[in-house]
Amino acid sequence: MQVTNHETIVVLDFGGQYNQLITRRIRDLGVYSELHSHKLTADELKEMNPIGIIFSGGPNSAYVEGSPKCDPAIYDLGIPILGICYGVQLMTHHFGGKVDKASHREYGKALLNVENQSPLFKGLPIEQTVWMSHGDKIVAPPEGFTVDASNPSCPVAAMSDESRNLYGVQFHPEVRHSEFGNDLLKNFAFDICGAKGDWSMENFIEEEIKKIREQVGDRHVLCALSGGVDSSVVAVLIHKAIGDQLTCMFIDHGLLRKGEAESVMETFTQGFNMNVVKIDASERFLTKLKGVTDPEQKRKIIGNEFIYVFDEESAKLKDKKMDFLAQGTLYTDIIESGTDTAQTIKSHHNVGGLPEDMAFELIEPLNALFKDEVRALGTELGIPDEIVWRQPFPGPGLGIRVLGEITDEKLKIVRESDAILREEIKKAGLDREIWQYFTALPNMRSVGVMGDTRTYDYTVGIRAVTSIDGMTSDWARIPWDVLEIISTRIVNEVEHVNRIVYDITSKPPSTIEWE
């Protein structure tokens, strides 16, 4: 549980798919927000001193025994509460209203009619499009609550009890399909909770530098530098805080993109004047990964080997004892590794792949930030655009973009095909429009014909998505002529490839990475 000096709106997690988006939208307004378990007690919440509380959506029915509930004492704290979807149903059930199964599930865009201009709907149109996703509905609001909005299939689409600062909506204002959703959240944060908006990257830098100095003291930090956005921002931020007390270790695990190792060393040793130690451990990693096909096992092996290499190599730094290991763990990494009400999507390389007996204390200065906030932080720190906007690259590297067993041949295919993809996307001027793009190698071959000869070679998959924060994403609509150029080049320039496929699934149901 984090306690912050910023005015904070706490989101209680009841297991809904959009919970992280609520947190992100509130931060977009300049108000700090955190996602916490619904099991948080009233005393724990009070200790955090939030200016507002949001109950998230969730897949359960509030009237069913055993469904997630919050500490009832939370309602007595006097802090404004906004219930969203399951959150408003939970509030209704608690205060004696009636929630029942809807005759049909309402999912998608719906027209909302605002009947009462409560503070939540201040300045908003009487008719507006919202995003619904629910199988239950409120049949009767609790005593003391006013119905603020409805539609034909949802008689209580919004309700409020202004005297107790309790508000609820059946729709999802955090989803961009709700056309005035951001305005509604702004009304809650500023007009109802009294926020002033004191969350910014400039403030974050000042506070984080102070925290790093207090945590580290006169000791030393070893930073796992990969050259990706996250580790680069971590390195520059910590270097700004403690200077030469930071040593960056760049481990080439043999799973890097084309030209990555050379680029990293040049950028950070010459551009930022940092102490960077390069370790070539590619043979060691690939030996450990030989014959391994399970993606979770691959992640664990890579995570463990990283720490073991750090342990061994830091011991060789005779003049400095390394006490801390810095990581670029993000808020999304922590969320995706599972909460009380959500299943683990995948063990994250910065969260679930660490051995329990490691010899370092962790320092993770970005673990409260989303990816786009990290980019903004990088810009604020003066990091060049080519690094800030570098394609996101996972800690396990190409190890999770080669599905199945990892071999030198497969790595070469992914490395070369990915370089072509990145080159052509940049040529087409799409590199800032597309959130993330890469190639992956499915564990499959297919029949083809090249030069009048039958081939039986690999298929390369292209993944490209648009997103704002990486919590949800849609597949990118790359122009056909650009895709044609990419496909033609890969098949002609990369050996042992005879087929290209394009991944057109969103997140959810898929994750961005294939493993």
Curated annotation (Swiss-Prot):
Gene Ontology CC annotations of this record: cytosol
Its job: Catalyzes the synthesis of GMP from XMP.
Q: What is known about its subunit structure? A: Homodimer.
Nucleotide-binding as a keyword?
yes
Q: Where is the signal peptide?
A: none
Please tell me where ATP binds in this chain. 226-232
Alphabetical list of CDD domains matching this protein:
GATase1_GMP_Synthase, GMP_synthase_C
Please name the PANTHER family in this protein's record.
Answer: GMP SYNTHASE [GLUTAMINE-HYDROLYZING] (PTHR11922:SF2), GMP SYNTHASE-RELATED (PTHR11922)
> Cross-referenced SUPFAM superfamilies, in alphabetical order?
Adenine nucleotide alpha hydrolases-like, Class I glutamine amidotransferase-like, GMP synthetase C-terminal dimerisation domain
Q: Which domain of life does the protein's organism represent?
A: Bacteria
Stored InterPro entries: Class_I_gatase-like, GATASE, GMP_synth_C, GMP_synth_GATase, GMP_synthase, GMPS_ATP_PPase_dom, NAD/GMP_synthase, Rossmann-like_a/b/a_fold
Describe which pathway this protein belongs to, using the record's wording.
Answer: Purine metabolism; GMP biosynthesis; GMP from XMP (L-Gln route): step 1/1
Pfam families reported for this sequence: GATase, GMP_synt_C, NAD_synthase
> What EC numbers are recorded for this enzyme?
6.3.5.2
The record's catalysed reaction(s) read:
XMP + L-glutamine + ATP + H2O = GMP + L-glutamate + AMP + diphosphate + 2 H(+)
| EC class name | ligase
List the Gene Ontology MF annotations in alphabetical order.
ATP binding; GMP synthase activity
Print the keywords alphabetically: ATP-binding, Glutamine amidotransferase, GMP biosynthesis, Ligase, Nucleotide-binding, Purine biosynthesis
| Name assigned to this protein | GMP synthase [glutamine-hydrolyzing]
The Glutamine amidotransferase type-1 domain, residue ranges: 8-198
Residue ranges annotated for the GMPS ATP-PPase domain, each copy included? 199-390
Q: Where are the active-site residues found? A: 85, 172, 174
